[in-house]
Amino acid sequence: MPVSASLAYKNYDYDYDSIQPYFYFDNDDEDFYHHQQGQPQPPAPSEDIWKKFELLPTPPLSPSRRQSLSTAEQLEMVSEFLGDDVVNQSFICDADYSQSFIKSIIIQDCMWSGFSAAAKLEKAVSERLASLHAARKELISDSSSNRLSASYLQDLSTSASECIDPSVVFPYPLTESSKSNKVAPSQPMLVLDTPPNSSSSSGSDSEDEEEEEEEEEEEEEEEEEEEEEEEIDVVTVEKRQKRNEADVSDSRYPSPLVLKRCHVSTHQHNYAAHPSTRHDQPAVKRLRLETSSSNRHGKQRKCTSPRTSDSEDNDKRRTHNVLERQRRNELKLSFFALRDEIPEVANNEKAAKVVILKKATECIHSMQLDEQRLLSIKEQLRRKSEQLKHRLQQLRSSH
């Protein structure tokens, strides 16, 4: 809070006589129906009703029980504030800001704007600021001025803390110089330094918000990875263990996100390629090698890691993938062999499986008809041969 406002609250110059016209007319002996002549009366309903609200702002805090400070002590107190750089940055505003503060001394209050009380208050504050600037110039030239004791400074800090925080009233920051970012070389993360008059809860709140945002990002990444892992059919994918959320909540400074590259072993099959006769034996060898290697890796993981259920699931999934890959390869080879047996699609390497099956069905029906026709011809020829044999025997017997 600016020291001008705190001093205006602490050392106020108004007495009852100067502010008496701004209060309500209150008389205990007054009769509201028979007003006495020659005495000031409250405003009638026809008059401006807003004149009732021409009051000064909230009165300052009650004065302390200590003796009032003399003029020299007050100037010493001001010099103490003006001499310290840290306090000067956080408590004392610039010249531009003081002008804007005078212009907007009453902010966000529709009851005070545009009245004579606001003008008088601004005039008093401007006079106070002018006197403070003059005192500061005089005290800076005097290098042998004595420092104020710690009790006075503590009293001023407590009185400033009891006043309203200007960040609640003013929507914009006080000074840009008071908000500086400092990087600690020993820590990988940024630490923000707060002004001296700010509360310590703001830093903890910002750190909690950062931790919550990082936890949300990690949960989203883990959900995406789980969705990708649910679609495993043939390709072997190693499931990464989920990060324990208790470690994230317990850690005071969360560690930055680490992105790891995982190699996914994929086997692409060219279904349009010509079938090879040397494919069956290497497939069996590869199956044995992969099963043996998977069993060996599974045993090592069982010995090293306590989570044996995950390793067993990985071994089962890997074995299932190998068997499924072998089954698909055998099915593909059988389709290639069937395609080569059908004359219509034998030369078409890009024939679809449905076309191969349809042409194979038609070819089978035509072959069955040909078989029946040939069987009937064979039967006719057999009968004819029997007749010829019987006639030949008759001719031999006659001779």
Swiss-Prot record:
Highest taxon of source: Eukaryota
Basic and acidic residues bias locations: 236-250
One GO cellular component term noted in the UniProt record for this chain: nucleus
Protein localization: Nucleus
Coiled-coil parts of chain: none
Pfam families xrefs: HLH (PF00010), Myc-LZ (PF02344), Myc_N (PF01056)
Region (Leucine-zipper): 374-395
Extent of motif 9aaTAD: 76-84
Start and end residues of each stretch annotated as Disordered: 177-254, 289-320
CDD domains according to UniProt: bHLHzip_c-Myc
UniProt GO MF annotations: DNA binding; DNA-binding transcription factor activity, RNA polymerase II-specific; protein dimerization activity
Positions of glycan attachment: 58
Keywords recorded for this protein, A-Z: Activator, DNA-binding, Glycoprotein, Nucleus, Transcription, Transcription regulation
Oligomeric form and interacting partners: Efficient DNA binding requires dimerization with another bHLH protein. Binds DNA as a heterodimer with MAX.
The protein's name in its UniProt record: Transcriptional regulator Myc
